[in-house]
Amino acid sequence: TLDEFVGVVSVIREAGIRVDITMNSTCDGGDWYAEETLNRQIGFIRDMHEQHGIETVTLANPFLIEQARQTCPNLEISASVLADIDCFSRAEAFALAGATTMTVDTSLNRDLKLLRQIREKLGVELKLMVNEGCLNKCPFRKFHMNLISHKSHEERDEGNAFSFACGDIIGRDAGQIFKSNWICAATRASQASSKLSAAI
């Protein structure tokens, strides 16, 4: 219930932790842009921000970002990784809509030049998803995310159809796992080992 949700938010904030509401659906059906739906979604964001101190909201739809920015000028708005921000022009569009933070598409995780360009020219904070679980350029990803978006309105889970789909690809070529866009963080031990090897 809403009261339970607000209660959880209060506990988190009392612990000194910032709260980020994630509303990054990639599809909300045919009524997504209906006035009633928009008023409900933006009204919820406004109430959570103004009455309950929510600091951040994460959205995937640039139209919702624009509406949220107009309603809550001081709210931190983060563009979700599901916004598929995979180039400068797309990042610019989301910045103009009102996003101040972006989790870029995982295809940019290792493109340091473009990441720097986006950050410096648009003045936004960038976040990277380091534990990407999807295959690189997965043909099922868009449809999987749409299914999850629709299922989020129901009390049933999404099932495992897409897990099997991805599993079939990996079963045919296990190397696809290593082609995914996860980031491997070097530990101090491995860095020291590399320096030692270089010295030798």
Task: Give each language-model segment a name.
Residues T1-R90, T103-I200:
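Active-site pocket-lining/capping segments in soluble small-molecule metabolic enzymes
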